[in-house]
Amino acid sequence: MTTSPTPFKTVRDLVRHAVSRFSQAKLAFGHGSDNAFDEAVYLVLHTLHLPLDTLEPFLDARLAPDEIDAVLAVIERRATERVPAAYLTREAWMHGHRFYVDERVIVPRSFIGELLDDGLQPYVEDPELVGSVLELCTGSGCLAILAALAFPNASVDAVDLSADALAVAKINRDNYGLDERIALYHGDLYAPLPQFKWIDPAQRYDVIIANPPYVNAGSMAELPAEYRHEPEMALAGGADGMDIVRRIIGEARRWLQDDGVLVVEIGNERANVEAAFGGLELVWLPTSAGDGSVFLIHASELPAVAG
């Protein structure tokens, strides 16, 4: 193990160093924090096994040489390799809930999560009456888990094309003890789901949610290095970002109850959504990012499915 540089003795020293190092490296944020200070505090506290919400009492705590070395190693990996913090710590937080993540999945970040805090009300009249939910492009399974918590009487089906992603989703599902309420399906959007779930109207879903790949080709080419560590298939949405969204909307009607809703997150692609689906009655939902990141469509407004 290397000898710790003498200038670093306390938590305060390491946080200050991390902020300087991250600023010097011109890092991009957006995988759990949006600035150098918050990311520095998180990585320092996590590496030292300290409570993530308690910085002040530990600021002037003197650290052992091996603790300093461990923190410096994490800071350098973040600064030089541009690895997202969540991959370094093997965890991500969403609305107070901790989830396991690694490089097999995109780092979870979704405004649908905050909408689930209120059970999608008022668009869902009573969350306790929701009996079934489908999440497409589940990735690490975070939204499926938040949906199960928001709709306590619902069964949740979660689908992903990546077997690796589903392995991570299984870890999270099992960590929350939801293996009897969340079923995982490996396949392309609706394809792996049992056909009786649309043939029998009683089996159709009350809610479908999706945070699909939606980054358009131009934006993909300009993504910061941090995003290059994530699976490309979880980000890239084709020329206008709408390749997967078109397919989700195109078949959603047959899988939804007559009074069901489809909720889709599209990041900064509102203009492309409106260009592609201008004939549909889209309801843009207010989130902490404004009203241009998540839209809802009532089942009655969705296009009919042939066949």
Curated annotation (Swiss-Prot):
> What UniProt keywords apply to this chain's record, in alphabetical order?
Methyltransferase, S-adenosyl-L-methionine, Transferase
Q: Which reaction does it catalyse?
A: L-glutaminyl-[ribosomal protein uL3] + S-adenosyl-L-methionine = N(5)-methyl-L-glutaminyl-[ribosomal protein uL3] + S-adenosyl-L-homocysteine + H(+)
What does the UniProt function comment say about this protein? Methylates large ribosomal subunit protein uL3 on a specific glutamine residue.
Give the enzyme's EC designation.
2.1.1.298
Cross-referenced Pfam families, in alphabetical order? MTS
Q: Which PANTHER family match?
A: 50S RIBOSOMAL PROTEIN L3 GLUTAMINE METHYLTRANSFERASE, RIBOSOMAL PROTEIN UL3 GLUTAMINE METHYLTRANSFERASE
The top EC class is transferase
Any idea what this protein is called?
A: Ribosomal protein uL3 glutamine methyltransferase
Gene Ontology terms for molecular function? nucleic acid binding; protein-glutamine N-methyltransferase activity
Q: Which GO terms describe its cellular component?
A: cytosol
Question: What's this protein's family per the entry?
Answer: Belongs to the protein N5-glutamine methyltransferase family. PrmB subfamily.
Lineage top rank: taxon? Bacteria
Could you give a single Gene Ontology term from the biological process aspect? methylation
